[in-house]
C-alpha cells in the first residue's frame, strides 16, 4: 500500500518544488504582452507611489545639476540657456521610459506572485493526502536516525536560521520581498525585522527543544546541548 502511494507523493513533492519557477517562467511570458498593452493604454496616477515620485524628482535634480556643472566647466554661458532645456527634456523622456518599465515589472511580478500563491494554495488543499504521506516519511526518516545525527541536524537548522550570520540572510530576504512587491524600502522596518524576528524564532526553537523534544528523547537534548556548547 505504501509503495502504491509513494510515486504519487513523490511526484507531488516535485510539483510543489518546481511550481514557483514554472509559474514564474510561463506566466511572465504570457502576461508580459497583455500587461504592457493594458498599462500603455490605461495609465493612471494611482500606480505612482511616493517613492517613485521621489525617485523621478531626484533623477531630475541630478540631471539638472550635471548639466549645470558641465556648462560651468565648459564656460559657455550663452549655450547654457539653449542646450540645458533640450538635454534635460531628452533625459526626462528617458527617465519616464525607465519608470514606465519599472511599473510594468512591478505589476507583472505582483500578478505572477498572486497566481503562484493561488495555485500553491489550491495544490496544498487538494493534496492533503500526499502531504500526510510526506509528513510521515519525514518523521520516519528523522526518528530512524541516531541521537547524534538528530542533534547535528537540529543544530544545523537552528544556526542556519537564527545563528550569528543569519541576520544578513534575513535582511536580504525582506529586501527581496519588498523589491519583488514594488514597495518602498524602509530601513527602519528592515532593522526592526532583523533584530526581532530571529529572536522570536530562536525562542520558539528553544521552547520546542526543551518542552517537546525533551519528552520524546531526553538523551537527544543532552547531546544537542553538548554539541552547541562545544
Swiss-Prot record:
One of its GO terms (cellular component) is chloroplast inner membrane. The gene is cemA. This is Potassium/proton antiporter CemA. Contributes to K(+)/H(+) antiport activity by supporting proton efflux to control proton extrusion and homeostasis in chloroplasts in a light-dependent manner to modulate photosynthesis. Prevents excessive induction of non-photochemical quenching (NPQ) under continuous-light conditions. Indirectly promotes efficient inorganic carbon uptake into chloroplasts. One of its GO terms (molecular function) is antiporter activity. The keyword Transmembrane helix applies. Belongs to the CemA family. It comes from Sorghum bicolor (Sorghum). Pfam families: CemA. It is found in: Plastid, Chloroplast inner membrane. It catalyses: K(+)(in) + H(+)(out) = K(+)(out) + H(+)(in). It is a multi-pass membrane protein. Its main location: plastid. Coiled coil: none annotated. It comes from the Eukaryota. GO terms for biological process: potassium ion transport. Keywords: Antiport, Chloroplast, Hydrogen ion transport, Ion transport, Membrane, Plastid, Plastid inner membrane, Potassium, Potassium transport, Transmembrane, Transmembrane helix, Transport. The chain crosses the membrane at residues 7-27, 106-126, 145-165, 181-201.
